[in-house]
Amino acid sequence: MGLTTPAWNINNTVVNGSNNTEHFSCVSKFNTLNFLTVIIAMFGLAGNAIVLWLLAFHLPRNAFSVYVCNLACADFLQLCTQILGSLECFLQLNRRHTFFLTVVFMFAYLAGLCMIAAISVERSLSVMWPIWYHCQRPRHTSSIMCALLWAFCLLLNFLLGEGCGLLFSDPKYYFCITCALITTALIILLTVVPSVSSLALLVKMICGSHRIPVTRFYVTIALTLVVFIFLGLPFGIYSSFLIMFKEFQSIFSYHVLEVTIFLSCVNSCANPIIYFLVGSIRQHRLQWQSLKLLLQRAMQDTPEEDSGERVPSQRSGELESV
């Protein structure tokens, strides 16, 4: 069966006759796209590393920053696998290593999507039921949820890799299809749930009897979700369909998968840009200050006063221990 291996592995079969030119052209386009992926991923690694460093060591920890920190970690891991995968293509290294990178890439991809969904749902809960959220919510919920989400994604991708012959055993067709169906359903669910919760929250903010002011953090999460839908979601859906339906491999060019991988790379790089951009907007204009202050503003879940910034509330910060 045809497996959805990443576009990091080129078929080295020599093509005779008139197909030589076409084969060379495909390889040239492939290398160009992967070169762009490496360049963009390097910038993304730097951005996510800065976010991780600031959230882990320089900013007070709260319920939402824990999720954002884990999202940055997932993006960092995903970008690392993309860079290594592109280098494997250039060096023509072991195909088995490429399969392993495929599993790690999907693991990081799903983990990042889980973090986005968790942030969006928890943000909606904090607005819809504020009394329960601030009084009854157990401590360390964010840390426990992140650990469970990482473990779940690791287990699911291990089963997917084993069933599809990407790790240690031969492919098992029906088991592989089953895992692919579960993965596809999970991707769709994790996209629909935060979209609906964010839309419901927006309606409550605009049309509710007690209007809730829009905070920077809501804007940050909304932009992150929108960017993922347009840039990150195509890879998850398309790669899953490649596993489940062989017809996709003949109908669509393999370069479509390469493009979706590239878009996923751009998505992982965009998140730090969103954080710092939202943090830099003040009184309808950009004000560039220290990265620490910009990130702190982007994580701010309290409304701003007309005269200036409010100090972020410590109540949400007390939900998690440092």
UniProtKB/Swiss-Prot annotation:
Coiled coil: none annotated. The chain crosses the membrane at residues 35-55, 71-91, 99-119, 148-168, 173-193, 217-237, 261-281. It comes from the Eukaryota. PROSITE patterns: G_PROTEIN_RECEP_F1_1, G_PROTEIN_RECEP_F1_2. GO terms for molecular function: G protein-coupled receptor activity. Residues 1-34, 92-98, 169-172, 238-260 are extracellular. GO terms for cellular component: membrane. Glycans are attached at residues 11, 16, 19. It is found in: Membrane. Residues 56-70, 120-147, 194-216, 282-322 are cytoplasmic. Residues 302-322 are annotated as: Disordered. It is a multi-pass membrane protein. InterPro entries: GPCR_Rhodpsn, GPCR_Rhodpsn_7TM, MRGPCRFAMILY. Orphan receptor. Probably involved in the function of nociceptive neurons. May regulate nociceptor function and/or development, including the sensation or modulation of pain. Belongs to the G-protein coupled receptor 1 family. Mas subfamily. This is Mas-related G-protein coupled receptor member B5. It comes from Mus musculus.
